[in-house]
């Protein structure tokens, strides 16, 4: 079974959504997510994923250091800050960086904020579906 770690700063939005998506795209892959400064999973991220039928409501936010000794096939950073201060994963076979907009920066009404989360979710979905199809099948 392949192991993938997805990192962002707060482990509350992007990495959580990416974990849920990649898990749904590849049954033979164990996907983890973590943050360099973990926060509670964002309710808008939970709602955006629920719209796709993926439940991340029971996910927890974890610190990146918790996974330092796991032999990962892939370690992703999905924000520039996480890339800059990412812990070293000496056992990772491949480190990959792809920055996505932080939906937590969204302003406006709840529906306007949710729309931003849905947009980022769709970008994550396209990216990680392509990755899974080309690397995990």
Predicted features along the sequence, with ranges:
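Cytosolic catalytic domains that perform sulfur/thiol-centered chemistry
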Residues: 2-4, 67-78, 117
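Mid-chain, well-packed structural core segment of small domains
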Residues: 70-91, 97
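Residues at the C-termini of beta-strands that transition into short coil/loop
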Residues: 35, 79, 99-101
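Short glycine-/acidic-enriched loop or helix-start segments at secondary-structure transitions
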Residues: 16-18, 43, 85-88, 107
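Conserved active-site segments centered on acidic
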Residues: 1-66
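Conserved small-residue
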Residues: 11, 49, 75-76, 124
């Amino acid at each position: 079974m392949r192991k993938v770690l997805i990192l962002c700063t707060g482990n509350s939005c992007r990495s959580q959504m990416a974990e849920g998506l990649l898990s749904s795209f590849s049954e033979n892959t164990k996907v983890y997510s973590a943050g360099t400064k973990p926060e509670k999973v964002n309710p808008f991220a939970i709602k955006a994923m629920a719209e796709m039928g993926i439940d991340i409501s029971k996910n927890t936010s974890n610190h990146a250091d918790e996974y330092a000794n796991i032999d990962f096939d892939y370690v992703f950073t999905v924000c520039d800050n996480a890339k800059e201060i990412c812990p070293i994963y000496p056992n990772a076979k491949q480190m990959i960086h792809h920055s996505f907009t932080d939906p937590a920066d969204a302003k406006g009404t709840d529906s306007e904020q949710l729309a931003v989360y849905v947009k980022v979710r769709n970008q994550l979905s396209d990216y990680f579906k392509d990755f899974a199809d080309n690397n995990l099948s």
